């Protein structure tokens, strides 16, 4: 098992990777008012960030295999912090989006490196436990982030961006930890052939499709549409939106905390099927909930779906390859995440503009059905489990 300093770095990187979107969700309506934006235009503050992440994630995976984890991690932390600081001084919406692109360039490597570092530091026996703890810790962060973002947003929409400076002490900590060294000269032909063979496996494709759909169900109807609906329908302030939205993270934390016990009894497919129902059911009635605080129940269930599904998918993807090609495989998975995070906010914003909130949540319901179908038809009852 890794030491305390190693674990602190690991959890710190995971918390930062979850901060880029959840911290600013409560101030999206305030941004829209300040700059006179539509729902789709306001959603670009998420899309620009996640598109930059999606671009950098596969690059970061290969570079960390070739040049070592530190050569990628340290610059990523500095760029991530720098982009957030620049947002504090942005004068126009165009400036905000440019700063978010810069920040996303730094965030891309963080999203894949926390899983790579976990797989480097922890043996296969203990990896599921660590992945569950990483998700639980991340969920604790995402409980706090919307609340902090909402409270700071009462002062100014810019204020939450100051929190991104927490990447700077994490960068200092990374200098004190011994990370995986560069491999030196690589046989690129063998590297890509071996990686390609793994990526073409049915299980691997199933994992990547699942992770795409899971994040689509999160970032479209929940992360993008709910804050805008909360202001339009319930006239909620940034702080109230942040408090209610924190129930997503509470559900995710509790589900992830209990996941190791559930994983010991249930197969991968069973867990994903349960998660699929938890993704689907809240979206069936979220648009018709009569009050803001009653939305906490479907948001909690949606968060539980994340806590049940994402850690075990990441766990299984991390064990697909060898240490030599692990980063490239995880980078493909994280790229699927970032593409989903980029496409779904824009898509669901357009749907909500044309068919209102009922249309957006009905589309999210359809995504949940797809998760159930993939889990049922791609994976066997006792396969794709990290217990193997």
Regions found by a protein language model. Give the residues of each.
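Helix-breaking motifs and short loop linkers at transmembrane-helix boundaries and internal kinks
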Residues: 36, 68, 89-95, 235, ...
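Conserved MFS/SLC helix-loop-helix module at the cytosolic interface between two early adjacent transmembrane helices
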Residues: 55-91
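Helix-to-loop junctions at the C-terminal end of transmembrane segments
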Residues: 57-68, 255-267
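Structural signature of the two symmetry-related core transmembrane helices
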Residues: 72-85, 270-284
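Cytoplasmic helix-loop-helix junction between adjacent transmembrane helices
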Residues: 99-138
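Helix-loop-helix hairpin linking two adjacent transmembrane segments in secondary transporters
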Residues: 133-176
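Juxtamembrane intracellular "pre-TM" segments in multi-pass secondary transporters
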Residues: 179-208
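A late C-terminal transmembrane helix in Major Facilitator Superfamily
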Residues: 323-355
């Amino acid at each position: 098992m890794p030491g305390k300093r190693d674990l602190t770095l690991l959890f710190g990187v995971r918390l930062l990777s979850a901060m880029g979107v959840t911290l600013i969700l409560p101030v999206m309506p305030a941004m829209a008012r300040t700059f006179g934006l539509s729902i789709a235009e306001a959603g670009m503050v998420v899309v620009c960030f996640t598109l930059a992440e999606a671009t950098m994630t596969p690059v970061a995976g290969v570079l960390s295999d070739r040049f070592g984890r530190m050569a990628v991690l340290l610059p990523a932390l500095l760029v991530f912090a720098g982009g957030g600081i620049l947002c504090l001084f942005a004068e126009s919406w165009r400036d905000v989006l440019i700063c978010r692109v810069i920040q996303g360039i730094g965030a891309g490597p963080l999203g894949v490196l926390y899983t790579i570092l976990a797989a480097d530091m922890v043996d296969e026996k203990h990896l599921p436990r660590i992945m569950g703890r990483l998700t639980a810790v991340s969920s604790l962060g995402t409980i706090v982030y919307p609340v902090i973002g909402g409270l700071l947003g009462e002062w100014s929409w810019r204020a939450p961006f100051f929190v991104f400076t927490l990447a700077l002490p994490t960068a200092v900590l990374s200098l004190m930890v011994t990370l995986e060294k560069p491999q030196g000269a690589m046989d690129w032909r063998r590297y890509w052939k071996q990686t390609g063979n793994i990526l073409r496996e049915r299980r691997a494709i199933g994992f990547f499709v699942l992770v795409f759909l899971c994040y689509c169900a999160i970032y479209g109807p929940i992360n993008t549409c709910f804050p805008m609906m909360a202001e339009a329908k319930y006239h909620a302030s940034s702080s109230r939106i942040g408090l209610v939205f924190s129930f997503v993270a509470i559900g995710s934390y509790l589900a992830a905390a209990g996941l190791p016990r559930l994983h010991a009894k249930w197969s991968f497919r069973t867990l994903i099927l349960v998660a699929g129902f938890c993704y689907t059911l809240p979206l069936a009635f979220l648009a018709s909930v009569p009050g803001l605080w009653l939305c906490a129940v479907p948001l909690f269930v949606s968060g539980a779906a994340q806590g049940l599904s994402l850690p075990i998918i990441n766990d299984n993807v991390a064990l697909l390859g060898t240490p030599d090609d692990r980063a490239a495989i995880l980078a493909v998975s994280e790229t699927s995440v970032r593409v989903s995070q980029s496409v779904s906010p824009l898509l669901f914003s357009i749907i909500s503009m044309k068919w209102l909130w009922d249309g957006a949540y009905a589309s999210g319901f359809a995504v949940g059905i797809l998760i159930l179908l993939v889990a049922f038809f791609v994976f066997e009852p006792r396969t794709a489990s990290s217990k193997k």
